[in-house]
Structures are given as structure tokens and as C-alpha cells.
């Protein structure tokens, strides 16, 4: 539940911010009557994403055996790559996002307004669907993913409304930095998941790298740890008895991306100063 909540909270807020920028600019330029076009594009995108996401979920949920392992491994890799790209893209473009959107809106037709809103929400929706599939394959609990995702969407919508009302008085930089780091940890878990699934797919069952890196048999950090264990497993890819290969994949991904993320943050501060 924790991973799906974080995913929909982040993605939902990004979509909400884009729509808020569009609506605010239309209001400031006395084009309030065209706001319904933005809302129409938003709701159409949500509906299309819901249908596509449901169909893909039904397809994936019906798989088993080697095919299931292959698909889950591919989904984990795809979600990890797209999630990483999304985080670094947002960091690089967040500062100029408002200006770029306003330039697109200036003198644009209703069709263009619809397209901007639709594409923005549809992109975030597809990313969300992919990430939630990755979360589902990791937790193996569709209901917890759905519940966490719905809660995240509700909270993101509420935050988006607050941002829309408050405008530029709210600084969301800290929020996006914290969620970015948490999502990179989630992506590292997906890297480990992908290696695990693909290793099982090819039948690699023996060797030094397949030996458990550690084994915890009791307590909150064990498989019998209940809600806490499920939360850590779903959000950070934690396992009570992971093979060394899985742990290695986790850190081979995590260390370089964290270094790169903090380096880009440092470079950004130096550029500003």
C-alpha cells in the first residue's frame, strides 16, 4: 500500500500542478470560459487511462508459470527505467514548466487546450499504471495496491486544489525532493525484483550469488512481520531472505542514481547562487 500511495500521490500531484497552471493562466487572461475544455481533456484522459490500466492488469493477473515470470521481470525493468527518467526529467524541467505551458496556451484554440490537458494527464496516468503494476508484482496484493493508489489520488487532488487556490505562495521543492528519493528506493527494489524474476526464468538456482545475503526468521523484519514487513517490501523491496544477486542489483542501481541525483541538486544550487 505504501508504494502505491506514494506513486499516485506524486504522479497525481504532478498532473494537478499542470492543470492548475493552465486554469490559473486562463483566469488571468480572461479566458475562464475555456477552462471547461481543460477539464474535459482531463476527465477523458483519466477515463482512457482507467480502461487501459484495467485491461493490462487483467491480462497480467491471468498469467502464470514462465510467462508470468518473464512479464513481471519486464514490467519491473520498464517501471524502474521510466520512473528514473521521470524523476530526473522533473528535476531538470520543473523550474521552466509554468513558462512553457503558458507559451503554449497563448493564442491557442480550444482543440490545443484539450490536447495539452489530455496529453499531460494521459502521460502521468500511463506512468502511474506502469508503476502500480510494478508495485503489484512486488507485493502480490492487488487490493492493497488499489487502496493505497486511491488514497494517494485523493490526497494529491486535495493538494492540487490547495496549490490552485494558493498559487505561488506554496514551495513544493522539498516535497518533490523527498518523494523523488523514496521513489528511487522503490525503483531499486524493482531492479532487484527484475533480476530475481529473470533469474528464476532461466532456471539459475545454484551458486554463490543465489545464496541468501541474510536470513531473518522472526520479528518485524521477517516474513511473519505482518503489516510492517509488507510495507517495507512493497515500498523499498525489502526481503527477509534475499539472494545475493538481488541485493547486488539493488545497490548497483541505487548508488549511481542517488549520486547523480544529489550531484544535479548541488549543480542547481551553484547555478542559482
Language-model segment annotations:
Residues 1-123, 128-273:
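Multi-pass alpha-helical transmembrane bundle typical of ion/small-solute transporters
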